[in-house]
């Protein structure tokens, strides 16, 4: 199991495999519709990959897209707030310079620290909600009083934290994130414009859009404020900055209490300006510092958490399990994403139906289903869609594009979700087991749908006709069959299908294409379902066992049919003759005998058959195809049963035994003919000579000899024969073919009887004995020649 899990993670799909990156110039050229389409697809891909545990950390492009999404939705509100904030900052700056330059008089200012009361973390937890609210009101009022008279220019960290605590209960999440971003931007602009100090280790510049760019001097990477700013703390001015760095760390720990992600933060103390490192990944990337190394694997990592995650993937360890769904994860990040899908309510809720969503664009797409707007239309079939991702997946059904390929087996898929489900098949993570039959499934929805087979639940009802179904697809197919909605026609035979996938699978019967190949024996199949059933013959995987006789089967339907033999149940009865059958297919074939229907007709000779298998066997006679070949002697057969009978001639296995004389045979039909000799059954009688025959074949051969009818004629010499087998043996004289070869000496023969007589010379067997002198012979013809001497 550990090996399967390790192999699964080795070929895991990451977000980078499915992501498409644009440069700044390319992004500017995209119109709003194209940007929305790109954002929806990227966010959906990231959500699918993160949900199954293949993406541990949020990529920078996703963070940036989320910010772009929030900026677009709240642009009007944020612009008003930014203007108000900039006005207040300008007023504070003017008041500050008035105090500094008024008559050169230096005044002793009252600061917030002199009137503030601070609590430790332990003391804060002991306060009840009323005491916390009172404390917040007093501290905020003191800060407003000092700010109004200009005695407090910079906002203390305590006030920022209290404001966040207050706003989290009243303001939406979107405004909260962007308000904090603007709060940090205000002091940063004041530092850059008035103090004119250079940021440590960072060169400040602006691009053509007015966005701030930061150039790291160690690795020469350039960063902007979106999607994520990661900078290095300078080590050049270590002498007098230890206290400031400690101050910055304290502020950072305080900010982490309220938000796990902060893009940019600038703090000032003692006249120094610093850019906090919210993510030290770039710093270690620049210095190539990989302090954590796995001794068993020889791999080095930047963080201890990375090493622990890698160790779990190698050992297959899964410590993070959610009891509600039963899924276990190697990484806590994947576990957190799974828990969030179960217990955390998404912030964007639909007012019509109450459904909630994680992203606002998903809510907008959902609202279109209520108002009936489907802006994305397929040019091929005219089908419309509400979301671009569904439209792109549908287009791939027309183009045949499958961009998501499995690295292990090479199978391709049109969606990333399909690839993720397929990768689970390689890992064989079937943790959800059915208590009734023991069948295991990869996901809980698959198990939930399977349980409906046992309990008979049919939640999907067709209101017009009153029919109920276990799946939603059953309702759709029934509606199409009743309304006549069948749009997919086969150009070759004219057959109509309700879906493109059904038509695509049907076309393989015309083209003979078998894309699903067994990697063990090389046998091809037209569908993946047939291949899965075939693979069980190699692995001997028989999951469904009969409790009465112990016989096991590869499919649940086979077990169900087998159980009817124990119970004697025959639910399918013929209304005309009363005969009952265990399977519906047997009844369908039986009814064709009453009606004389033969739906399967040969296009070459016009012969019709009641069963498709009979037509398939008949077509092989036209094409000469003999797919069942025995490798030892090279003989091939049209049907598999003939190959099985032929194998018994090599092995000597004779399962059909006569109870009267204990003589055994390799074929049941030969035993049936032998039993007629004991019963003295001679049903066919010749009117010309008066002889009786046990079967019709011998009777017809006798008639041919009397009437001298020889319908089988040789094309080379013109010689005619009464039997087709005699013509086949005669043709080998012209062709020189000798298919029957002796394994002992290598001698070859034209007929099987010739080889059998030859084998008796090796074994010393002489079954033909003379009645007069008792001498035995290996062949019947030798005995006849000997009788002439007497």
Curated annotation (Swiss-Prot):
Q: Is Isomerase there in the keyword field?
A: no
Q: Which Gene3D superfamilies match?
A: 6.10.140.140, Classic Zinc Finger (3.30.160.60)
SUPFAM superfamilies associated with the record: beta-beta-alpha zinc fingers, KRAB domain (Kruppel-associated box)
- Zinc finger regions typed C2H2-type: which residues? 284-314, 348-370, 376-398, 404-426, 432-454, 488-510, 516-538, 544-566, 572-594, 600-622, 628-650, 656-678, 712-734, 740-762, 768-790
Enumerate the SMART domains for this protein: KRAB, ZnF_C2H2
The cellular component terms of Gene Ontology attached to this UniProt record, alphabetical and capped at eight, are: nucleus
Which Gene Ontology BP annotations are present? regulation of transcription by RNA polymerase II
Q: Does the keyword rRNA-binding apply?
A: no
Tell me one Pfam family matched here.
zf-C2H2
Q: Residue limits of the KRAB domain?
A: 13-84, 110-181
Q: Which PROSITE patterns match?
A: KRAB (PS50805), ZINC_FINGER_C2H2_1 (PS00028), ZINC_FINGER_C2H2_2 (PS50157)
Molecular function GO terms recorded: DNA-binding transcription factor activity, RNA polymerase II-specific; RNA polymerase II transcription regulatory region sequence-specific DNA binding; zinc ion binding
Give me the disulphide-bonded residues. Answer: none
Recorded hits in InterPro entries, A to Z, give: Ikaros_C2H2-ZF, KRAB, KRAB_dom_sf, Znf_C2H2_sf, Znf_C2H2_type
Where is this protein localized, as stated in its record? Nucleus
The family classification in the record reads:
Belongs to the krueppel C2H2-type zinc-finger protein family.
What does this protein do, in the record's words?
A: May be involved in transcriptional regulation.
Any idea what this protein is called?
Zinc finger protein 560
State the organism of origin: Homo sapiens (Human)
Source lineage: Eukaryota, Metazoa, Chordata, Craniata, Vertebrata
């Amino acid at each position: 199991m550990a090996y399967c899990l390790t192999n699964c993670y080795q070929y895991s799909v990451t977000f980078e495999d499915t992501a498409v990156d644009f440069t700044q110039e390319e992004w500017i050229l995209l119109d709003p519709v194209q940007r929305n389409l790109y954002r929806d697809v990227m966010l959906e891909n990231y959500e699918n990959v993160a949900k199954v545990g293949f993406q541990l950390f949020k990529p920078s492009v996703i963070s940036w897209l989320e910010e772009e999404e929030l900026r677009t939705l709240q642009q009007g509100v944020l612009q008003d707030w930014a203007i108000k904030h900039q006005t207040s900052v300008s007023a504070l700056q003017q008041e500050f310079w008035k105090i500094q330059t008024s008559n050169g008089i230096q005044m002793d200012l009252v600061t917030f620290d002199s009137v503030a009361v601070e609590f430790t973390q332990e003391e804060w937890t002991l306060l009840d909600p009323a005491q916390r609210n009172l404390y917040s009101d007093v501290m905020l009022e003191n800060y407003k009083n000092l700010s109004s008279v200009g005695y407090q220019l910079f906002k203390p960290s305590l006030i920022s934290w209290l404001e966040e605590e207050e706003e989290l209960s009243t303001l939406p999440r979107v405004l909260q994130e962007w308000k904090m971003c603007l709060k940090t931007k205000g002091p940063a602009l004041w530092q850059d414009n008035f103090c004119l100090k250079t940021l440590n280790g960072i060169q400040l510049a602006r691009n053509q859009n007015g966005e701030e760019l930061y150039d790291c001097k160690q690795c020469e990477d350039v960063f902007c404020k979106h999607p994520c700013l990661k900078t290095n703390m300078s080590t050049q001015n270590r002498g007098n900055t230890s206290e400031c760095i400690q101050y910055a760390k304290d502020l950072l720990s305080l900010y982490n209490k309220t938000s796990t992600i902060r893009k940019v933060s600038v703090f000032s103390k003692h006249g120094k300006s610093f850019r906090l490192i919210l993510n030290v990944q770039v710093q270690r990337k620049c210095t190539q510092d990989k302090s954590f190394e796995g001794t068993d694997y020889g791999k080095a990592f930047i963080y201890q958490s990375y090493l622990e995650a890698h160790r779990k993937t190698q050992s297959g360890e899964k410590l993070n399990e959610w009891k509600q769904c039963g899924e276990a994860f190697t990484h806590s990040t994947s576990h957190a994403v799974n828990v969030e899908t179960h217990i955390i309510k998404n912030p964007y809720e639909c007012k019509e139906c109450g459904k909630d969503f994680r992203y606002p664009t998903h809510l907008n797409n959902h609202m279109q289903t209520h108002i009936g707007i489907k802006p994305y239309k397929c040019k091929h079939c005219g089908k419309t869609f509400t979301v671009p991702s569904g439209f792109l997946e549908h287009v791939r059904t027309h183009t045949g594009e499958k961009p998501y390929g499995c690295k292990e087996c090479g199978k391709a898929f049109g969606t990333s979700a399909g690839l993720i489900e397929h990768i689970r098949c390689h890992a064989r993570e079937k943790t959800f087991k059915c208590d009734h039959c023991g069948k295991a499934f990869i996901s809980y929805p698959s198990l939930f749908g399977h349980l409906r087979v046992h309990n008979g639940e049919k939640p999907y009802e067709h209101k017009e006709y009153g029919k109920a179904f276990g799946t939603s697809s059953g309702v759709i197919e029934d509606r199409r069959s009743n309304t006549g909605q069948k749009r997919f026609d086969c150009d070759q035979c004219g057959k109509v299908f309700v879906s493109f996938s059904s038509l695509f699978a049907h076309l393989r019967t015309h083209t003979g294409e078998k894309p699903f190949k067994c990697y063990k024996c090389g046998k091809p199949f037209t569908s993946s379902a047939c291949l899965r059933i075939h693979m069980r013959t190699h692995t001997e995987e028989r999951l469904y066992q009969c409790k009465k006789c112990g016989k096991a089967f590869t499919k649940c339907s086979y077990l169900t049919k087998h159980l009817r033999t124990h119970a004697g149940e025959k639910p399918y009865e013929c209304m005309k003759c009363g005969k009952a059958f265990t399977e519906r297919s047997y009844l369908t074939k039986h009814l064709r005998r009453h009606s004389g229907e033969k739906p399967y007709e040969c296009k070459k000779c016009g012969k019709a058959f009641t069963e498709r298998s009979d037509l398939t066997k008949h077509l092989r006679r036209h094409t000469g195809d003999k797919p069942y070949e025995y490798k030892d002697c090279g003989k091939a057969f049209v049907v598999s049963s003939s190959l099985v009978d032929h194998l018994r001639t090599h092995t000597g296995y004779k399962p059909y035994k006569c109870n009267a004389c204990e003589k055994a045979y390799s074929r049941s039909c030969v035993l049936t003919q032998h039993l007629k000799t004991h019963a003295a059954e001679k049903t066919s009688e010749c009117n010309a000579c008066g002889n009786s025959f046990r079967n019709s074949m011998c009777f017809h051969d006798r008639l041919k000899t009397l009437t001298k009818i020889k319908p089988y004629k040789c094309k080379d010499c013109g010689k005619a024969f009464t039997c087709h087998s005699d013509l086949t043996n005669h043709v080998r004289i012209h062709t020189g073919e000798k298919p029957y070869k002796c394994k002992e000496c290598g001698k070859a023969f034209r007929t099987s009887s010739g080889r059998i007589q030859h084998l008796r010379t090796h074994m010393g067997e002489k079954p033909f004995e003379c009645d007069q002198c008792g001498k035995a012979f290996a062949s019947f013809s030798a005995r006849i020649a000997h009788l002439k001497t007497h």
